[in-house]
């Protein structure tokens, strides 16, 4: 094992020879990061990415100034999907070290799960990984049910069954109940619903290669809400929360769904399929119906749902939609506390009517006359939330995954959003 490179923090600027914009300098003792007080966490993360780019795979965070947030910022930039890295952490008090360890365990799980190849991570594997993670932190406070394949059709989960039936790997619904009260009649405080499309070819509305090559990550919403529940549990969540993961492949076969098909949901809504690549909303609808039936105080769904959200925000922010201004404000406050990027986009009553169909109550995609694709997708989902005007948040996970590295992130999953949702659950 090579000797660790020492990484220290300084509030003094770098020597002028490094240039006026230098954020780090190198000497015989190691590497010094020069904090300027403006965006110290971002500076640390960007510097860590550069350090990894130098091929330095063993570091020691040394000296004064390190806390859990700064250590975590370093790790966010330093971690990458290829190769191994070792960090020797500084001395932290027990609470800060526990917080850091929980982030490393759970958010790394989210990133690694999203990065996993689709060949290794099908619908059943995703559901089981989620069960294993939550059980690891919650023990016997968790019960769950897995429904798959034809059982979904027989029980009326027609959106999930329709999307997933084209794959040899059966679609799966995971319904997990975290109940720390021990009372089977305890009210459900919150429901989390995640889109778990383990590979999205687009179906017969097939994607081009440039848009399909990252579609192993189309289960990012499911991984995010799973991680959020696990992380909230480590922070002392003492209320009952249910998790619904809607897991499927969206593939082409002789049994795959087709344009013009009509799906009838358990709440009576009929949906005409006019784009098989708008499948995420079709599977989420089943999860939202189940969530609404629990009568929780809040429902949060998360999905890598639309390209429109990425067009608006890039990969830098998660898009937030809600009719509930107070609840949206609470989530944005949680995001600010956790230093995670969320941005609210419009969702109005008229978006709910911008999915007209000649043959059903709803179309699963908007027409050229209604180009606000992220907002109309949220409007579609609202039809499956019983009390959509209160207590419902929709997160379009545009910051979940990066196809290419940037100055602060490696290629792949980011894990962003986990801490924000956990913060809201435990507030």
UniProtKB/Swiss-Prot annotation:
Keyword Manganese carried by entry: yes
Single GO term (MF): metalloaminopeptidase activity
GO CC terms, sorted: cytoplasm
Domain of life, per lineage: Bacteria
Cofactor note: Binds 2 manganese ions per subunit.
Intracellular or extracellular location(s): Cytoplasm
Reactions catalysed according to its record: Release of an N-terminal amino acid, Xaa, from a peptide or arylamide. Xaa is preferably Glu or Asp but may be other amino acids, including Leu, Met, His, Cys and Gln
EC numbers, comma separated: 3.4.11.23
An example Gene Ontology biological process: proteolysis
Positions with a binding annotation for Mn(2+) 2: 195, 200, 218, 279
Binding sites annotated in the UniProt record for Mn(2+) 1: 200, 277, 279
Active site, renumbered: 207, 281
Keyword terms: Aminopeptidase, Cytoplasm, Hydrolase, Manganese, Metal-binding, Protease
SUPFAM superfamilies: Zn-dependent exopeptidases
InterPro entries linked: Leucine_aapep/pepB, M17_PepB-like_N, Pept_M17_PepB, Peptidase_M17_C
UniProt keyword Electron transport present: no
Annotated function: Probably plays an important role in intracellular peptide degradation.
HAMAP family: Aminopeptidase_M17
Family named by the database record: Belongs to the peptidase M17 family.
Subunit structure: Homohexamer.
Annotated PANTHER family: LEUCINE AMINOPEPTIDASE-RELATED (PTHR11963), PEPTIDASE B (PTHR11963:SF20)
Name the record gives this protein: Peptidase B
Source organism per UniProt: Escherichia coli O9:H4 (strain HS)
